[in-house]
Amino acid sequence: MKLISPSLLSADFGNLQRDIEMLNASECDWLHVDVMDGLFVPNISFGQPIVKHIKRHAKKPLDVHLMIMDPGRYVEDFKNAGADILTVHYEACTHLDRVLHSIHDHGMKGGVVLNPHTAVCLLEDIIQECDLVLLMSVNPGFGGQKFIENTYCKVRQLKELCLRKNPECLIEVDGGVNLQNAPLLFEAGADVLVAGNAVFKSDDPAATIHQMKQ
């Protein structure tokens, strides 16, 4: 499986509807929306009102990544805003199983995010509850960072865990993804790639998405 989820954090916020319509017409599979609270990560980005606006124009599923403290408090809010897929950080959840059950109870796909230096083995007892796992390949909070090379190893480790305990679980990678490392990530076992600057800073974003899926 080779899915592309362009990150709207790298879109032109002054022309967001235009960029969403471009993605609707492209071969991308999901739209990735980064929600940041200024506490769990230093930056602040989208909230529920912006997600709701994006949903009005998007024709692809919304892949909403919560980079916030205590994400379980906001599951219903983001369901109401239009999230189809909701991922929460392992590092931000005291009771991760409760949060995942809440996401599923609200009719969304649910997943766990691991920061670059959080070990894959920590998912051993929760992977069965995950529809996907998102591996951060940069430190979260800002777009345009350099890809962390150890990510390939983590993808392979996670793939082994998924095959052993939850073969239906998708592996998503977010951060520094480009045309050079995309095929290597798919080869390592990734199913979904989040691409920001590589798509939106290219001369032809739709063509870049097509190339990434090859």
Can you describe what each PLM-predicted range is?
Residues 1-87, 91-95, 102-110, 122-130, ...:
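Conserved N-terminal beta1-alpha1 strand-loop-helix module at the mouth
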Residues 32, 172-173:
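Generic enzyme active-site microenvironment
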Residues 138-140:
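Short glycine-rich anion-binding loops that position phosphate/pyrophosphate groups of nucleotides
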Residues 173-176, 194-197:
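Glycine-rich beta-strand-to-loop/alpha-helix junction loops that act as flexible
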Residues 176-188:
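Acidic, divalent-metal-coordinating active-site segment for phosphoryl/phosphodiester hydrolysis
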Residues 184, 193, 200-202:
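Catalytic cores of soluble, metal-dependent hydrolases
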